[in-house]
């Protein structure tokens, strides 16, 4: 039995969706629970060549044997959730998903306020999904909960009980984090942050798990970090330089072009300490060196690719156990047991 949390090590968009999907297929957990803020973060999952952009349903949905759960600490947008469940019908998501009855609910008034507030939309670069205003209402104890929304009734349950029961039964459990550690309301580059903490301890609390139940924390880092929206970015490169390197990307939720930078070893070290990371997953190694594309054996990586992995381990102080070399789940190097 292993309970694993996956956390973003940068400003989101690290490729957590790919890593989570891989682990959910490889480790075959009985339940995959989502922590985090809400539908302000998007994950892209590629299954058999088809891409799925999702914001509410847990990224591990391709594992049709696992229950899917959205923890009480996650804000829920019923419109987004129902739309995703319908879109993912062939994966039988509607019959497997549990929405905690204590989840806060985002309404149209929250989205409208998010988009119309000049400070949030222009200065901070909010995604406009209503999460910040909804969290304000939660703090004021006026927010509607999932149990109050009739269209969610057939999906409701107690996620904390489900996750704890799975652990007690000796099953594997995976907890998905969203966004990235550097967007944390408390530990990120305030005020250019999200409306809540985005670290491993908070993700455990989001799904109702105590800290002693966590076995592994996997921090996910992209070889070239990216950021959407405003805020400091110490190693940022010019857009022209990013184009030359072939690392032009757009946000899953906003569609905005992502800012790109070089790997920041010092920040990565701080993030791993903050999250108690036991493992590191490196994504987009094929962007760092195209010769690494599609490689599934560590020994076959280019010298440049190996040198980068070694540098991460030496400077950050945490072992790299998972390496993504392409968008497909099969394009993954897994050295956790080596």
Curated annotation (Swiss-Prot):
Q: How is the cofactor bound?
A: Binds 1 Mg(2+) ion per subunit.
The pathway that the record names for this protein is: Purine metabolism; AMP biosynthesis via de novo pathway; AMP from IMP: step 1/2
Report the superkingdom from the record.
Archaea
Q: Name one GO biological process term.
A: IMP metabolic process
Query: What does the entry list as the binding residues for GTP?
Result: 12-18, 42-44, 258, 284-286, 324-326
Q: Which gene encodes it?
A: purA
Q: Where in the cell is it found?
A: Cytoplasm
In Swiss-Prot or TrEMBL terms, this protein is called: Adenylosuccinate synthetase
Q: Which residues bind IMP?
A: 13-16, 40-43, 127, 141, 179, 194, 256
Q: Which reaction does it catalyse?
A: IMP + L-aspartate + GTP = N(6)-(1,2-dicarboxyethyl)-AMP + GDP + phosphate + 2 H(+)
Please classify the protein's predominant subcellular localization into one broad category.
Answer: cytoplasm
């Amino acid at each position: 039995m292993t309970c694993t949390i996956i956390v973003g090590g940068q400003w989101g968009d690290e490729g957590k969706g790919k890593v989570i999907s891989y682990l959910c297929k490889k480790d075959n957990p009985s339940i995959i629970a989502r922590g985090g803020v809400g539908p302000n973060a998007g994950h892209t999952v590629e299954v058999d060549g088809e891409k799925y952009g999702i914001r509410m349903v847990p990224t591990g949905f391709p594992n049709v044997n696992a229950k899917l759960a959205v923890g009480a600490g996650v804000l829920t947008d019923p419109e987004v959730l129902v739309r995703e469940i319908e879109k993912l019908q062939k994966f039988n998501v509607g019959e497997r998903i549990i929405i905690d009855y204590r989840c806060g609910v985002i309404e149209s008034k929250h989205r409208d306020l998010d988009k119309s507030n000049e400070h949030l939309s222009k200065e901070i670069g909010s995604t406009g999904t209503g999460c910040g205003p909804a969290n304000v209402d939660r703090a004021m104890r006026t927010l509607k909960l999932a149990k109050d929304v009739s269209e969610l009734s057939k999906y409701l349950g107690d996620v904390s009980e489900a996750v704890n029961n799975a652990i007690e039964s000796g099953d594997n459990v995976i907890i998905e984090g969203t966004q990235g550690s550097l967007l944390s309301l408390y530990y990120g580059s305030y005020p250019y942050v999200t409306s809540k903490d985005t670290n491993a301890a908070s993700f455990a609390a989001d799904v109702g798990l105590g800290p002693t139940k966590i076995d592994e924390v996997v921090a996910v880092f992209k070889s070239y970090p990216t950021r959407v929206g405003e805020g400091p970015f110490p190693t940022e490169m010019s857009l022209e330089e990013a184009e030359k390197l072939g690392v032009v990307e757009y946000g899953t939720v906003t569609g905005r072009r992502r800012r790109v930078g070089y790997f920041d070893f010092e920040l990565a070290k701080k993030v791993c300490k903050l999250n108690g990371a036991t493992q590191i997953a490196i994504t987009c190694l094929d962007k760092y060196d195209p010769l690494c594309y599609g490689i599934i054996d560590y020994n076959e990586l280019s010298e440049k690719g190996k040198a980068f992995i070694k540098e991460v381990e030496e400077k950050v102080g945490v072992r790299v156990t998972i390496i993504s070399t392409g968008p497909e789940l099969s394009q993954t190097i897994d050295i956790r047991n080596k």
